[in-house]
């Protein structure tokens, strides 16, 4: 009885405290330069964990940081075999001992399958928190998947898989519906945070999102509506995080479409962990820098209050934050390239979003 009482007191004290976690996605191209600085920031901020929303390495081309560090030139085969181990060594290991949770991005599917992903990253997909939650949901479920969830500090963190245009599939949609039903009935769960690679459809970044395929638009809209329904019926908090687009956009679902079709969920696009920086979409024209900015690296620090409210602060990683050993490894000119030249000047236009929203279905892109 005394042991039970002490455990209850400990759980109560933890749930009554403010705590933090770090999250960002898209660390290809220059992630080996940027991610160690994110790791240092997460440690300094006392983050309980780091959540990576996908796209670890480019895979369709050579990552510039790997080319810079290589002692001999890569072949296609040698690069492909080295890319994921490079990510683990240079991007994940600096976080130790902070736990890391991984989400799958579309670049993880380049020359690979989900089976390859599960084999390479099984150590992270079978973290005790994940396995314990999977078996609590279904004692007979012994399948390791790219999508999973875990409950921590009164928050259900749901990692979804939309890394290919056939996602979400029906089993994954059914799975998230079951989770939300349990969360609605669980008084210990105050908040749901859904993380994924591509943003759900009809966001301010919809030209590079689940709008890009018919299945993505249909299934992503279903999940969005399920989250709206969960929030309305349970009076619990919901936040949606994504990356895929390599910039920062807050209030990403405060779009004309969702204002007219059910409501706006709090959402942030945070694809700023080292990938080539995209131009902001014209849907963000006139936004202040705190709401939309590009040509920056950094991460979100989620600050969880005792009532389940989460405040997301953007922590920018500047050139001066890159650790000295990283500068020595890649050279000052290599680090400077990541900050000055790692940019894509392609425009992101709302006319493409309008085509995607048309009754005929999403537009085909070259």
Model-assigned labels for residue ranges:
Residues 3-12:
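Sec-dependent N-terminal signal peptides
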Residues 16-78, 365:
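N-terminal active-site segment of His-dependent metallophosphoesterases
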Residues 18, 46-47, 97, 187-191, ...:
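A general structural motif
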Residues 21-23, 50-52, 102-103, 194, ...:
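Residue-level marker for buried hydrophobic side chains located in beta-strands
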Residues 26, 54-55, 105-106, 197, ...:
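Active-site glycine-centered loops adjacent to acidic/histidine catalytic or metal-binding residues
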Residues 64-188, 209-239, 245-293, 298-303:
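Extended active-site neighborhood of metal-dependent phosphoesterases/phosphodiesterases
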Residues 183-208:
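Short acidic, glycine-rich surface-loop motifs adjacent to enzyme active sites
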Residues 248-361, 365:
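Binuclear metal-dependent phosphoesterase catalytic core
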């Amino acid at each position: 009885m005394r042991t039970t009482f002490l455990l209850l007191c400990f759980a109560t004290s933890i749930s009554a405290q403010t705590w933090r976690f770090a999250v960002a996605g898209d660390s290809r191209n220059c992630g080996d330069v940027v991610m160690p600085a994110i790791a240092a920031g997460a440690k300094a901020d006392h983050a309980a964990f780091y959540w990576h929303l996908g796209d670890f390495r480019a895979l369709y081309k050579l990552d510039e940081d790997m080319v810079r560090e290589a002692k001999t030139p890569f072949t296609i085969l040698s690069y492909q075999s080295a890319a994921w181990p490079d990510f683990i060594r240079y991007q994940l290991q600096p976080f130790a001992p902070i736990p890391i949770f991984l989400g799958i991005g579309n670049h993880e599917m380049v020359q690979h399958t989900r089976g390859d992903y599960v084999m390479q990253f099984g150590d992270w997909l079978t973290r005790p928190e994940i396995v314990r939650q999977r078996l609590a949901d279904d004692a007979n479920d012994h399948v390791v998947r790219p999508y999973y969830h875990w409950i921590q500090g009164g928050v259900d963190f749901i990692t979804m898989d939309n890394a290919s245009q056939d996602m979400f599939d029906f089993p994954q949609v059914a799975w998230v519906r079951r989770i939300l039903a349990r969360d609605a009935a669980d008084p210990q769960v105050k908040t749901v945070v859904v993380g994924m690679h591509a943003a759900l459809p009809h966001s301010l970044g919809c030209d590079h999102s689940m709008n890009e395929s018919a299945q993505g638009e249909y299934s992503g809209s279903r999940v969005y509506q399920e989250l709206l329904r969960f929030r309305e019926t349970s009076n619990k908090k919901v936040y949606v995080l994504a990356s895929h687009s390599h910039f920062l956009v807050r209030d990403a679902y405060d779009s004309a479409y969702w204002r007219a079709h059910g409501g706006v969920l709090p959402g942030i696009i945070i694809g700023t962990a080292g990938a080539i920086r995209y131009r902001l979409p014209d849907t963000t024209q006139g936004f202040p820098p705190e709401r939309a900015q590009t040509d920056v690296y950094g991460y979100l620090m989620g600050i969880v209050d005792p009532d389940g409210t989460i405040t997301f602060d953007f922590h920018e990683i500047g050139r001066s934050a890159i650790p000295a050993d990283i500068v020595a490894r890649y050279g000052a000119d290599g680090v400077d390239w990541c900050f000055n030249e790692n940019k894509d000047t392609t425009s992101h236009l709302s006319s493409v979003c309008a085509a995607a929203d048309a009754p005929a279905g999403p537009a085909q892109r070259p």
